[in-house]
Amino acid sequence: RTKSKFGARLEPGSHIDIQLYTGRTFDTVTQVESIFNYGEALTDDYSRWTIAGAILEAAERFTSHEHEPALQEFKLATGAMKALAENRYEPSMILDAYLLRSLAVGGYAPSLTNCSKCDAPGPHRYFSLVGGGSVCADCRPSASATPAPETLKLMSDLISGNWESAMESELRNRREANGLIAAYLQWHLERGLRSLQLVERA
């Protein structure tokens, strides 16, 4: 529960320093200091605003255990929001990079070079949601996808932060990466992000 005087500082996309009184059922906001309102910089751009919503929803899903610190996820989320607000890179690529890195922090990083089953050196032709990413011809499950090598290279660039290389990727590979990442995320979170349905991809 909160008092109305804190409303503006508690808008979606706000980076805040907050103090709470812990109650039996609900926590009560007692003090809020605004650090930066990323949402304010994004509200006039529908594409970036919906991507920000997807990042925030994902952050909530990746930090579902209350009262447990999640510093790495916090840094990833604020970094992604800052990059969006400053319009540093193509917005949907910021989202995909954030999702891949959050999966990695959670222990679900997809293998993008070696086979995720037998560790045979890659790159490999097949990608499996069930198998944990790239898989060789001998290990591939029947429902494996066959993404372009450039798509897996793009995903590797995004997870490692190699933006110079990522920005040189072609649109078809970005779109293919979008689909793989969304499907991989849904598999490991057991359900997809509702806000992804609203995201306008390039």
Task: Give residue spans per PLM region.
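Non-catalytic alpha-helical scaffolds and adjoining flexible linkers that form interface surfaces
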Residues: 1-202
